[in-house]
Design a protein with these regions (language model features):
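A charged N-terminal "starter" segment
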Residues: 1-144, 188-192, 223-226, 391-417
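Electropositive phosphate-/nucleotide-binding environments in soluble metabolic enzymes
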Residues: 12-15, 31-38, 61, 65, ...
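Charged (often Lys/Glu-rich) extended helix/loop segments that serve as interaction or gating elements
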Residues: 22, 258, 265-417
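Conserved, mostly hydrophobic/aromatic
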Residues: 37, 60, 82, 114, ...
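A cross-family glycoside hydrolase active-site/sugar-binding cleft signature
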Residues: 56-58, 79-81, 100-102, 123-125, ...
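Active-site-proximal loop/turn and secondary-structure-junction residues that shape catalytic pockets
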Residues: 61-63, 84-85, 105-106, 126-128, ...
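Solvent-exposed alpha-helices and their adjacent loops that cap or buttress functional pockets
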Residues: 91-94, 116, 138-142, 161-163, ...
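Active-site loop/helix belt of alpha/beta enzymes
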Residues: 152-289, 347, 378-380
C-alpha cells in the first residue's frame, strides 16, 4: 500500500493534491496519511493472529495527537519514555493500561504519576531504577508491575546512534546482572514481575539479529523459570526498518511467525514506531532560489535542518520528488539546502530534478523522527502538520508564529531601585 502517489503528473496524499494542501496550509508542511498509519499498524496486529500480543506503538517516532488518536481508535498500546508522552497518549484517547514505560532516567515524579494512572508495565533499565520504582511503590502502598530490560549484546547493521543492544550502550542490564535483579524483584512486596524486555536498535532490515536476541532472551527466561520466576510476557522491542532508498525490508508476517515459533504461550509485546508512521508522512518544502555556481547546483528551499534533522544528524537519505512535473524548469543535479547558517543544513544531496523558483519538493518517508526532532534553531517557527483521510484533511498542529518563539521568555531587569 502506498497512499502517496502521482496522478496526472502531480503528487497526491490519498485523494488530495499536495499542491492544494500547500496552498491552504503554507510551506514548509508535514503531511500524514491516516489510512497508511492504520494499514501499517494492522499489518503487525494481524500477523499475530490469535496469539496473545500487544502492539505498543513507540510514541517517540511521532507524538502528534492526531497520529496517536488514529492508533488509539485501533486499540493500540503505546511505548512511552517520559510522562509527557504518557499524558499525550491519554489526551489522544489511549489507555494507560496498555502503555509500557521505557527509558533509562525515570524520575520519582514520573514513576508516581505512572502508577497513579495505572500503566501496564515499567521496563526497568538498571539496578538503581529498580530500587527507585520499589521505593515509590512502597510509599504509595502498592505494587509496581515491572519487566527488566536485558541487553542481549547483539550487533546490528544500522547507524551507531540508533544501535541499542550492545554492552557499550547505555540501555538495559547484562544477562548475568539481570538474574539477581529478577530474584530481588520476585521477593519484593512492592514489585510484580510481569516479563522480560529487550530492544536492539532501530532501522534494522534483516531478521537474523532479532532472532539472535530472542533466543538469548528465551534462554534467560528458562533459567528464571528454573529459579521459580515465571514470565507472563516477552517484550521484543521495535526496530523494524523501512525503505528510504529502495532497501530490502523485513517481511512482517514472516518475522512475526518466526517469533511465534519460539515463544510458546508467552504473550508478545512489540514496539514498532518507524514502521508504523515512517512511510505515512512526507515533508514538503518550497524552492526559494536556484543557485548554480559551476561547481555545485543548489536549490535553496524554505525547509531546513531544524525542520527535518535526519539528513544532517545521521546522514540519512530521503527520496526527493518534485510535487508537480515542470517541463519549464531547469534540469540539473541539485543539493537541497535550507536557510540555516550551517554548512550542514541540507535535506538532500546530488538529486536529479527539474525545478524552478516556487516549485514544491517532497521529502518522502518523513513521518518518523521528523517533526519530533525539530527545533527553533535560528529563531525559526516550527512548521504545521496536516492529516489526510481520503478526500478530507485537517490541521493537526498549528504553525508556530514568530511571537510564539519568545512568549515564555522575559528580560532580566538588574536596575537598582
Amino acid at each position: 500500500m502506498n497512499t502517496f502517489s502521482f496522478k496526472n503528473k502531480a503528487l497526491y496524499a490519498e485523494s488530495v493534491a499536495v499542491t492544494d494542501l500547500m496552498e491552504q496550509y503554507g510551506s514548509p508542511l508535514y503531511i500524514y496519511s491516516r489510512s497508511q498509519i492504520a494499514s501499517n499498524w494492522q499489518q503487525f496486529n494481524q500477523a499475530f493472529g490469535d496469539h496473545p500480543h500487544l502492539i505498543c506503538y513507540a510514541v517517540k517516532a511521532n507524538s502528534n495527537l492526531g497520529v496517536l488518536n488514529v492508533l488509539a481508535k485501533l486499540g493500540s498500546g503505546f511505548d512511552i519514555v517520559s510522562i509527557g508522552e504518557l499524558e499525550r497518549v491519554i489526551a489522544a484517547g489511549g489507555k494507560p493500561g496498555r502503555c509500557v514505560f521505557s527509558g533509562v532516567s525515570k524520575t520519582e515524579t514520573e514513576i508516581q504519576r505512572a502508577l497513579e494512572l495505572g500503566i501496564y508495565c515499567f521496563n526497568v533499565e538498571s539496578a538503581a531504577e529498580l530500587d527507585r520504582v520499589e521505593s515509590v511503590a512502597k510509599l504509595m502502598s502498592t505494587k509496581a508491575p515491572i519487566s527488566i530490560r536485558v541487553n542481549p549484546d547483539v550487533d546490528v547493521n544500522t547507524h551507531p546512534y540508533i544501535a541499542t543492544g550492545l554492552k557499550e550502550n547505555k540501555f538495559g542490564v547484562s544477562v548475568d546482572r539481570s538474574l539477581s535483579l529478577y530474584k530481588k524483584a520476585e521477593f519484593s512486596k512492592h514489585l510484580d514481575v510481569f516479563g522480560l524486555d529487550y530492544h536492539i536498535g532501530s532501522q534494522i532490515n534483516e531478521v537474523s539479529p532479532f532472532i539472535e536476541a530472542l533466543e538469548k532472551a528465551l534462554e534467560l527466561i528458562s533459567q528464571l523459570k528454573a529459579e521459580g520466576i515465571k514470565m507472563s510476557h516477552i517484550d521484543i522491542g521495535g526496530g523494524v526498518g523501512i525503505a528510504y532508498n529502495e532497501e530490502k525490508t523485513i517481511n512482517i508476517e514472516k518475522y512475526v511467525q518466526s517469533v511465534l515459533d519460539k515463544v510458546g504461550d508467552l504473550e508478545v509485546i512489540l514496539e514498532p514506531g518507524r514502521a508504523i508512521v515512517g512511510n505515512a508522512g512526507i515533508f514538503v518544502t518550497q524552492v526559494e532560489y536556484l543557485k548554480q555556481s559551476g561547481v555545485k547546483s543548489f536549490a535553496i528551499i524554505d525547509g531546513a535542518m531544524n525542520d527535518l534533522q535526519r539528513p544532517s544528524l545521521y546522514g540519512s537519505y530521503h527520496q526527493a520528488i518534485a510535487v508537480e512535473d515542470n517541463s519549464k524548469g531547469i534540469k540539473d543535479t541539485w543539493d537541497l539546502v535550507g536557510p540555516i547558517c550551517e554548512t550542514g543544513d541540507f535535506l538532500a544531496k546530488d538529486r536529479e530534478l527539474t525545478l524552478e523558483q516556487g516549485d514544491y519538493v517532497a521529502l518522502m518517508s518523513a513521518g518518523a523522527y521528523g517533526f519530533v526532532l525539530s527545533s527553533n534553531y535560528n529563531s525559526r517557527p516550527r512548521v504545521a502538520e496536516v492529516m489526510v483521510s481520503g478526500s478530507s484533511h485537517a490541521l493537526v498542529r498549528k504553525r508556530e508564529t514568530v511571537g510564539s518563539l519568545f512568549e515564555n521568555e522575559c528580560i532580566f531587569n538588574d536596575e537598582i531601585n
